[in-house]
Amino acid sequence: MSKKIKVGIVGATGYTGVELLRLLAAHPDVEVAAVTSRSEAGTAVADYFPSLRGVYGLAFQTPDEAGLEQCDIVFFATPNGIAMKDAPRLIEQGVRVIDLSADFRIRDIPTWEHWYGMTHAAPDLVSQAVYGLSELNREAVAQARLVANPGCYPTCVSLPLVPLLRQCRLKPGMPLIADCKSGVSGAGRKGNVGSLLCEAGDNFKAYGIAGHRHLPEIRQTIAGLQDGIAEGFVFTPHLAPMIRGMHATVYLHLSDGSNPETVLRDYYRDSLFVDILPAGSTPETRSVRGANLCRISIQQAAQSDVWVVLSVIDNLVKGAAGQAVQNMNIMFGLKETHGLDAIPLLP
């Protein structure tokens, strides 16, 4: 590509923001033209993030000063409630937008307002947003002006689950259970007691049992694939004592004698970022650390009709910034691996 794509990042001081900067620094087709932060305006990116010294000469600007309307695409790595106020103006000016918050993920406005506790500022734009689960919605993403980047838990659960629900029949009346674990970075960079080392280290706990915001997002994704499947879906997240990583264990009660391992292998045979492991393997979170990968395995429980699906991602990469870059590549007709060919870190 002769002319580079001009990229803006709104809210670039959080973990997903710095991941976007890290990944885009290695992208051959883009120029990061603007990074914004109201609290750090005037601070050099390299001073705020020493990991980026020698990579970026930019300084943070306020959104009003950054000239975002001159960009080809803008990423919103902001808390919930920001993109829905600021994205409509950019879209009207022809700028394409990828929102990494939850503002445009849930199509039913009352449901979104119930779970996120605020009035939606751009309800008319929600119906235009494309849900950016890249492997499952590629054609729509390619045409999108606005992409709602999925949450980390929905990505980890939906990538294995959707192909299986499309082709395998579950036993009626049996619950569909997703038991998930996340690293502490999933809570974001803003300080809170629960993410302190003395609280999260050497500890393991469930949370959000009465209801997690990613529950309606997953239910929306699987609704209609089988009768009553969304209503019977149970999701329990846990906080694990690690910085990065996400692990989902999904239990399927099958009734039709199909082979779910074959289904997954066939569906993701040519996938660039979804890896179906050999039979009997179990994926580890460290096997995807820093990479835009989802590794999946599936095994039948002993003396049971239950199949156990295991899925791992890096919550900050495939679960956030990496999938956002993948969606950008699809939107602009670029090679999907551009900026995303990093090998996982070990140890």
Curated annotation (Swiss-Prot):
EC numbers for this chain: 1.2.1.38
GO-annotated cellular components: cytoplasm
Gene3D superfamilies assigned to the protein according to its UniProt record, in alphabetical order: Dihydrodipicolinate Reductase, domain 2, NAD(P)-binding Rossmann-like Domain
Oxidoreductase listed as a keyword: yes
Pathway info: Amino-acid biosynthesis; L-arginine biosynthesis; N(2)-acetyl-L-ornithine from L-glutamate: step 3/4
Molecular function GO terms recorded: N-acetyl-gamma-glutamyl-phosphate reductase activity; NAD binding; NADP+ binding
First-level EC class: oxidoreductase
UniProt xrefs under PANTHER family: N-ACETYL-GAMMA-GLUTAMYL-PHOSPHATE REDUCTASE, CHLOROPLASTIC-RELATED (PTHR32338:SF10), N-ACETYL-GAMMA-GLUTAMYL-PHOSPHATE REDUCTASE, CHLOROPLASTIC-RELATED-RELATED (PTHR32338)
Record GO biological process: L-arginine biosynthetic process
The protein's role, per its UniProt record: Catalyzes the NADPH-dependent reduction of N-acetyl-5-glutamyl phosphate to yield N-acetyl-L-glutamate 5-semialdehyde.
Active site: residue positions: 152
NCBIfam families, sorted: argC
Compartments, as annotated in UniProt: Cytoplasm
Assigned protein family: Belongs to the NAGSA dehydrogenase family. Type 1 subfamily.
Catalytic activity reported: N-acetyl-L-glutamate 5-semialdehyde + phosphate + NADP(+) = N-acetyl-L-glutamyl 5-phosphate + NADPH + H(+)
Full protein name: N-acetyl-gamma-glutamyl-phosphate reductase
Species in which this protein is naturally found: Neisseria meningitidis serogroup C (strain 053442)
Keywords assigned by UniProt, alphabetized: Amino-acid biosynthesis, Arginine biosynthesis, Cytoplasm, NADP, Oxidoreductase
